[in-house]
Amino acid sequence: TSIIKKLESTLKASIGKVYVGIGGQSLRTIRNTEVRHLEEETKISQELIDSLMDSNREVPIIDQDILEVAPQEYKVGINLLADPVGVPSDHIEGRFLNIIARSSVKQNIDKCFHQAGIEIADYVISPLALANAVLTNSERRSGCMLIDFGADTTTVSVYKNNILRHLAVIPLGGSNITKDICSQQIEEEDAEELKLKYGNAYIDPSKDEEETPNYAIDGKCSIEAHLLEDIVEARVNEILANVWNQIVLSGYDDKLLAGAIVTGGAANLKNMEEAFSKRTKLEKVRMAKDSQLSLKGGIE
């Protein structure tokens, strides 16, 4: 409630309802196919498409809720169509990508806001809101992956033909780099400062750079330069290996013509763009920074 009061003071307006973003490790996607056999050949109607959507949402998933649905395509005969309405057929398959999360996630959020006396207007899937803010229509259409390097997690979203094709949350982020530096008997606050000031995501072995024996901050602590570089680069490589594994699992690793769009606090490390280019098979990498989230959607 104190946050709401601060916002109301800043906006000079009262807040009746709030939008709540859902992200983090509980999010993932699963695929589902719904089939309808028709008694005779007839034109596919919007009502039939809606029925497929409803059946998909009713699929039981133990301890999980379907938060959003991204229709992938519809198989009519031998053709895969984004919009089959009006096409004659006696058989249709609807293919869906369901974004799911543990049931306890929404339950806990509902409980917290109810106790605070704040009404929830709607839930927003944070990775989808981020995609609306940073991706261009061309990137979504041509095929791209959006990587959000957070403190505790790294979120991977894959788009092709303006449709979300895959979403996964990796339990690794910038704070893991900080913790690795802490293992050298350095306090967390100092480790974070060393990371931000001297951290390098990629060291080009072909370049002869002036050697620095130690990195230090305000005389408080120091660390051997090569050791800090090894620590940061090793963890970045691990995160990028996990990112690329998700891209391969999506089945779109060779279909992303627009490459990768990288954002998030941990993406600000020096040479992150180069690291991404070297550690993945994508030629195009765009760093997207300081983007504001939007609530507009492209998901049913």
Language model features: what each stretch is:
Residues 1, 20, 113, 148, ...:
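Residue-level signature of catalytic and energy-coupling elements of molecular machines
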Residues 1-145, 163-165, 174, 188, ...:
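Nucleotide/phosphate-binding catalytic cleft detector across ATP-hydrolyzing
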Residues 1-10, 178-182, 293-299:
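N-terminal phosphate-binding loop and adjacent alpha-helix
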Residues 22, 200-203, 255-279:
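Glycine-rich phosphate-binding loops at beta-strand->alpha-helix junctions
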Residues 22-24, 146-153, 159-162, 171-175, ...:
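A short acidic Gly-Thr/Ser loop motif
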Residues 46, 50, 279-300:
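Conserved phosphate-binding/catalytic loops in two-lobed NTP-binding clefts
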Residues 114, 139, 275-281:
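Short, solvent-exposed amphipathic alpha-helical segments in soluble enzyme
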Residues 171-187:
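A conserved active-site cap/scaffold subdomain adjacent to cofactor or substrate pockets
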